[in-house]
Amino acid sequence: MIDYFEQLIPEEQEEITEVIQTLFRQTFLLERKFDRRLGRMQYTHEYRVCSKHFEFLKLYFAAAGITLNENVQMGLIYIQGETLWGEKLPRLATIYLLILKLIYDEQMASVSSSNHIVTTLGAINGRAGEFGVLRTLPSPTEIRRTVALLKRYQVIEPLDVLEELNESTRLV
């Protein structure tokens, strides 16, 4: 296993190291991510590196009791194992994540031809209010932190400027 890694050029070794660190940090890699500049989904470099060296990475993680899996239909590579501890999400991030899942499922059920949806912060906060999980509207700082956290984990991509968050801010 080490021989395989040592035979790679230094750039590839560095790419594999970055992929391993990303998987340990967020436990998954997405095949495609929304590129705001181009206005469309783009393939991610990390996913391609992981796919190219999948067998090596599978053995690498197996040595630590961690399973590396790929879901081709969802465009996802992820790790699983009892020794993994994910980051604890703040309450608002958890609420937004669950509401986003509901909105996504509803739009997919309405025979959407796209695998991503566009919604607004107003729609998310409105749904959270309907379910009674938000008693008051969160502060702009708390919303900004939550959106930044979900963006970091590649759950959402704001279409509008992050500093100008309001109810009409669009999210993919």
Predicted regions and their residues:
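Short acidic, hydrophobic short linear motifs in intrinsically disordered regions
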Residues: 34-44, 111-130
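Short acidic, glycine/proline-enriched loop segments that cap or flank alpha-helices
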Residues: 108-116, 134-138, 159-160
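Short, cationic-aromatic polyanion-contact patches
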Residues: 80-83, 161-172
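Eukaryotic partner-binding/assembly regions in large regulatory complexes
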Residues: 1-82
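Short alpha-helical segments that sit at the start of domains
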Residues: 10-15, 81-118
